[in-house]
């Protein structure tokens, strides 16, 4: 059986776009689509009492009208969206979950709302957060913290960039150098040598660049790429870089089952998911 791509949808216009996007993805990787449509127990009660028409036939007709190329399985669940997604992730073990987000008019507000946060933190698959955007889909920003997940994250980013004939922008954000002052006391003040600080920053940048170059050499990237190093807050630097290069995709990482749902940049990743104007691929190493 072909591997599955899970696609939760609702009744918003963006769902049509995300289904076509997921269809292209499935065709490229020879996967099948599992389209999930959830409805609450209250809605189901109205249907059973005859006060509301069963939406399943019209939903399936709408899906058929899209003329998707991939093999499609439709799953209707009586559940909250997040619970339904997590349930199917456990049952099907899909290789990817593709979820939609609204356009820039509601940037960062995912169509499942807080349920999406729950899926991001408790889910067991990589997640692609699709957003309607005017940004360049061929420019791909990849924040890297050089942790254990960075190699597999970079390989996935390279694969995604190749599929869209894109360019990778590899970002490593450094902490500002620490200054330890001994003696003198705060009353008198202490003069810090600006030349020393500049030298220390240059040393940290050089060390970070070498580490990033070693990672790139190990992965043997096939896509064109550019290295970016800076000091500051990771999510702010990532957003600023994405703005400068007009990036339509950002690839970020999540740890494996040893810290399930804890994204490598912690709250930084939550901020990016809700504030970045392009699509995001949240990478997670799957268990064999």
Positions of the model-derived regions?
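Structural beta-alpha unit
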Residues: 1, 21, 42-46, 53-54, ...
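Small/aliphatic-rich secondary-structure junction motif
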Residues: 1-52, 139-194, 219, 224, ...
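Hydrophobic alpha-helical membrane-association signature
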Residues: 18, 55, 153, 208-211, ...
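General small-molecule cofactor/ligand-binding pocket signal
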Residues: 34-36, 73-77, 128, 171, ...
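A short acidic, glycine-rich active-site loop
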Residues: 53-57, 191-207
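Gly/Ser-rich helix-loop-strand patches that form or flank binding pockets
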Residues: 83-135, 240-288
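Alpha-helix-centered segments that form part of catalytic cores
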Residues: 205-217
